[in-house]
């Protein structure tokens, strides 16, 4: 199975688009190379009231997905966006590393 470069709970920075420069936590990774990021790509959705589900109508603000190519993972050591590489350890397991300093992201 291929290892994903960005996973749930990673902190990412938007590198292009309307929210450029903002950072947030990945809430969900969608199968079509898209991400839901907390506080990024917010839209207002108008919702009708639904008494069957006890839902109140109004204007809701929610996140839409953003393509994975529009974000970069946040490197806390360098305090900036970084690229992700994949390194195979001696025991055969693969880990994600930061390209700038070679530091392991997760074990």
Curated annotation (Swiss-Prot):
<keyword id="KW-0699">rRNA-binding</keyword>
<keyword id="KW-0687">Ribonucleoprotein</keyword>
<keyword id="KW-0694">RNA-binding</keyword>
<dbReference type="InterPro" id="IPR041988">
    <property type="entry name" value="Ribosomal_uL24_KOW"/>
</dbReference>
<dbReference type="GO" id="GO:0005840">
    <property type="term" value="C:ribosome"/>
</dbReference>
<dbReference type="InterPro" id="IPR014722">
    <property type="entry name" value="Rib_uL2_dom2"/>
</dbReference>
<dbReference type="GO" id="GO:0006412">
    <property type="term" value="P:translation"/>
</dbReference>
<dbReference type="Pfam" id="PF17136">
    <property type="entry name" value="ribosomal_L24"/>
</dbReference>
<dbReference type="GO" id="GO:1990904">
    <property type="term" value="C:ribonucleoprotein complex"/>
</dbReference>
<dbReference type="InterPro" id="IPR003256">
    <property type="entry name" value="Ribosomal_uL24"/>
</dbReference>
<dbReference type="GO" id="GO:0003735">
    <property type="term" value="F:structural constituent of ribosome"/>
</dbReference>
<comment type="subunit">
    <text>Part of the 50S ribosomal subunit.</text>
</comment>
<dbReference type="InterPro" id="IPR005825">
    <property type="entry name" value="Ribosomal_uL24_CS"/>
</dbReference>
<dbReference type="Pfam" id="PF00467">
    <property type="entry name" value="KOW"/>
</dbReference>
<dbReference type="GO" id="GO:0019843">
    <property type="term" value="F:rRNA binding"/>
</dbReference>
<comment type="function">
    <text>One of the proteins that surrounds the polypeptide exit tunnel on the outside of the subunit.</text>
</comment>
<dbReference type="InterPro" id="IPR008991">
    <property type="entry name" value="Translation_prot_SH3-like_sf"/>
</dbReference>
<protein>
    <recommendedName>
        <fullName>Large ribosomal subunit protein uL24</fullName>
    </recommendedName>
</protein>
<comment type="similarity">
    <text>Belongs to the universal ribosomal protein uL24 family.</text>
</comment>
<dbReference type="InterPro" id="IPR005824">
    <property type="entry name" value="KOW"/>
</dbReference>
<keyword id="KW-0689">Ribosomal protein</keyword>
<comment type="function">
    <text>One of two assembly initiator proteins, it binds directly to the 5'-end of the 23S rRNA, where it nucleates assembly of the 50S subunit.</text>
</comment>
